[in-house]
Amino acid sequence: MAITAAQVKELREMTGAGMMDCKKALTATEGDMDKAVEFLREKGLATAQKKASRVAAEGLCKTLVSEDGKKAVVVEVNAETDFVAKNEKFQNYVADVAAQAMNTTAADIDAFLAEPWALDTTKTVKEALAAQIAVIGENMNIRRFAQVTEENGFVASYTHMGGKIGVLVDVETDVVNDAVKEMAKNVAMQIAALKPQYTSDSEVSAEYIEHEKEILMAQIQNDPKESQKPAKVIEGMITGRIKKELKEICLLDQTYVKAEDGKQSVAKYVERVAKENGAKITVKGFVRYETGDGIEKKEENFAEEVAKQMGN
């Protein structure tokens, strides 16, 4: 039977698949729309397995906060190209993943992928992901998620660079007003910009400090001038350098990026806001995700990629 342009258009709108793929599906199923959708799903799942060898290092971080502000989630979903990361279908899918993660009881990403997909419980999250790979046309990966709950305060969220970075901040406080919320947002922006590894120096292990001291001592011993200095001077140098490093990697010790004097720490900024609002405020922790962080991107020759797609 003849396949009409209207049928192709309808199937394309239903599935988001390519025009030629839709035409092939309709031809193979003799114009049966439901069977054509299944045909594309099956074809898509097979294609998804093929695409899985390609590196998904771009993508999007999405945050979601409950209405009462007590609970929040951040997810990272990767794609192969920045172009797809800006695609509306991809962004909507990431929002759906965030909604799923908000309500999950999964302890890790593997358990999350194995649970039923809330929008279609006949599929698992992993199977729904494979279907999206077929529709969008690139390898994708739900890389990670994190939930933060704070009953005695609220959780602030912030996304930066169009979702390249997603941040959650756990704020314990007995006062929740606009000023305190603005403070939390400013702290989240600080985290996005300066990438702290810890909330405070109390979280840094003694093993980490000792390891850093050993490295610094080795550096000094390998320096002809510094190695000749008295032991007490060397000890003071190491202590000073450790202190400087902790100031860089611990959020509350960092210099607040908006400090008018260029010296005020994040801790002092939080203290000032607490005092001004008659509040007790503690920044208990944070989560910072950056898309593709730690993923090695695969570089391919563009001409070779085009030739590959053209079948040459």
Name each region found by the language model.
Residues 2-312:
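N-terminal assembly/interaction segments in proteins that build large macromolecular machines
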